[in-house]
Amino acid sequence: MSAPGTRQFDSTKPLPGLQIERRCFTVVDGDEMFGLPVQSVQTIFRIEGVTPVPLGPADVEGLVNLRGRIVTAVSLKRRLAKAPLDTARGTLAIGIEHDGENFALIVDDVGDVITCEESAEIARPPHIDPARARLTSAYYRLDGGILPILDMKAVFDFAERNRSTGSAHLNTAITRSDQ
Amino acid sequence: MDELLKDFLTETAEQIEAVGTQLVLLERDPSDAAMIASIFRLVHTIKGTCGFLGLNRLGQLAHAAETLIGRIRDGATPTPDAVTVILAAIDRIKAVLAELERTAQEPEGDDEDLVQALELQTAAVAVPARHPPATALETAPPEPANTEPSRPARTAEEPALQVRRPETIRVAVGALERIMLLVSELVLARNQLLELTRRQSDDTIKAPLQRLSGLTSDLQDAVMRARMQPVGRLFSSLPRLVRELASEVGKKIHLVTEGAETELDRQLIELIRDPLTHMIRNCAAHGIETPAERLAAGKPEAGTIRISASHEAGQITINVIDDGRGLDIPRIRQKAIAVGLAGDAEVARMSNDDICRFIFAPGFSTAGAVTSLSGRGVGMDVVRENIEAIGGSISLSSTLGQGTCFSIKIPLTLAIAPALIVQAGGHRFALPQVSVVEAVGLGPGAAHTLERVQGAKVLRLRHEVLPVADLCQLFGLADQANDWDAKLVVVMRVGALSFGILVSAVADVQEIVVKPLGASLAHLSVFSGHTILGDGSVVLILDPAGLAGSLGLQRTSDYNVTAPADLTAPALERTRLILFRAGSDPLKALPLSLVSRIESVASDRLTQSDGTLITMHQGRLMPVVPASPDVALTNNLHPILVVSVGGESMGLLVDEIVDIIEEPLEIQIAGGADDIVGTAEIRGEAVDVLDIMHFIRQARPHAELRGVARRFKILLVDDKLFFRDMLAPVLTSGGYVVTVCASAADALALLQRGIAFDAIVTDTDMPEMDGYRFAEAVHEQPRCGHLPIIALAAHPTAPVLAAARASGISAVAGKFDRRALLDAVRTCLSFKDLANTELEQRVLTEKAA
């Protein structure tokens, strides 16, 4: 029940009349840069004391105690299926809450908050690896390069993935680490 | 809703419960004047308030009931008929109140029937003239004080009421839960602080910290106590239940309750309500004999059901004892053999208590007649499951002709649990202490030894041989000390199952606050949650039931109901299999139908390209995947199984082809790894049956994306883990991709998220939403209108088939009839052209992209 006279605004949508733009928090993984929707980033911290989860998904590094709260640490590198399983773990993490669960997304480095104008959005290049494309919601043309925006829903879709029988992330990780 | 009405509803709900109980007591002891007065008072208050709030229908009913009760209070004997009609009136009042609570309106309809019956009884019960009215107030019209909706007037005439209602305030359950949660966090913070200061010798901080620690414990205790309620709350509804049961089965039954003041967590009180009711039903229906039988046996005519609650070492014990005929052991033995729970020889070796435990097996009932009370084949197994689900246990003992005693043990609370912190492979895990029986050292000279049987570890403990789960092995952890001597086996008991867990050490015993796993990890059945230890580190909490499952033990496996041998059943279908060796693991197999050719390729013709092996096959490049990571690449010729994937081929590299055989393929253990469907016993040897889809995904990832190798997707819904685990491999081995759900609600949630399935296989008998209603709900979903649904029933009888047809279910299969299930699925899907649907979906997804 809302009091008369107040209006509810959806903070994720632009107010009418304003230039449509999107603020992104940039993160670096290897030589690639990604954008995260700024409203989904809660905190940035160094993780220590990770408790691994045996039998858990390969891209879940483990559980971390973040100020008395248990968060699930997910490696962006493994999520993108770039790293063989034994790569040393980074310690820089971004706190993100998704679907009631607290996650720590482990990245190599963090960058600035940048503003992406609607006019700079480009269509998804069609030949991007479908597994990768699935994790991305949009692409923006910047001066320095193209910035893919990570889709938080797809990145943290464990619940769905665990329910389905497939485990594509494992397969990719294994084939790539054969080398 | 009106505040007054809300207060009225909460208040009356409790009072009306009390009236029902007291009336039953009154029937037994009509001389208790104080009780009559309090019953009268309650109905009187309801009537008064109804007038005040303008609830006419309720008012009339309450008035009629009040008149009759008033007559009884004035000295009339409460006949059973009078009590029955008063109980009926109270039931009606309850129903009207429930409706009021939902809609804030009195429901339509009148209660003329009941009002008349009440008036009839009022006329029938005679009032002896010698009883003058007790006080003036009781016959007076409602006074302003009585119409106060939130509280019955506390006047000097009501000493009984005053004693019964000590000073209390209402607190929302949510508020208590929140306090509990905060205290849990406080306990954790305290533990962390203690851990930090343990290494310091600063005395200035030690004293206040000790005090903080003590206060925290006290606070925790106080909050736990606030959540506690006397178990009498649960007992209060029992006299009425027993009265009804007794009249229904035509027996005389006394109920005795003891230890009503024993307190336990309110959450648990609600959770044991159903199991307890069920057990009492059982006692009334099976335990207690008819009056004639009892007299013939030299017992008093009326049977007694005694329910007692007591505290025992951090647990609550509730006993349900009857003085009836006791369990009929020979009959249970016969039935157990008949339904295939055990063999003749096995049963002969069993003790009476062990045989009694068969009544906890699913679908086990020795009752000849099916009554509305019991004997429907559902019962004690559900009781056992419910009790075990809250970390409790149930046992029974019985003496023929003298009675039966069921004993339930449950923990005091679910929120904070003592746990063993165990170490394995350098990691720590928490193990709930309630399931731990003992820890057994394996050092030299120890009385018990760990042995290997065909690679599996077992512990010989006294006269038992227990399967042992090696945590390091199970979790793939590097094991520093490969020396069993230094290790421990923690012996666990879940229900009737015992097993061991091999760990390196027990590091600590701590009280842990159990927190559930997030969605990302909730699928790991071996963990039940996680917690933060005193030193701030996170540990996973092992789930004893899940661990038992990982050993292949099922909660119900010791009662494994196998259908009685059916001589007319068709023999299992035989499958042509290719057996081969790849890597060091057991023999592997693939259905031959999947293999189009077997080639021999020299190592030098295998080229590495982009991380994948490639070879030339029939003039085209073909990716080759090793069937196991440790297939040796030598210079010899390598056998390669060529598998066709919709026009493209891939090779599966193996070490050696062993044989091609024709055998019935029955997956006995569902695969844990991605690359196998499961393990089957072939010619007395365990063979891994490979999941070819896994290798196709590796070699030709796009083939699957394009859908050429797509398989039908089936959603399996069953509330019982046992059946999910049994049927999922059956469907998988039938070539389907199976997703399992434990409830109709979960399944609907999946469909709502747009996950597409080609067919649904659902149990019919599920709590909350049964299979029929689920089927209807599915067909109401967008895009699911024509989704074929196959129902599982214990016995596909005519009424089941009719109900299934009415709710749009395509076919019904028996739960234990694998062949019928696969046939039904195949028939339902036969009209679905895989290729066409695939094309359609592809076009749709491309459009969407």
Residues covered by each model-derived region:
Chain A
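An acidic, low-aromatic, low-complexity terminal/linker signal
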Residues: 1-179
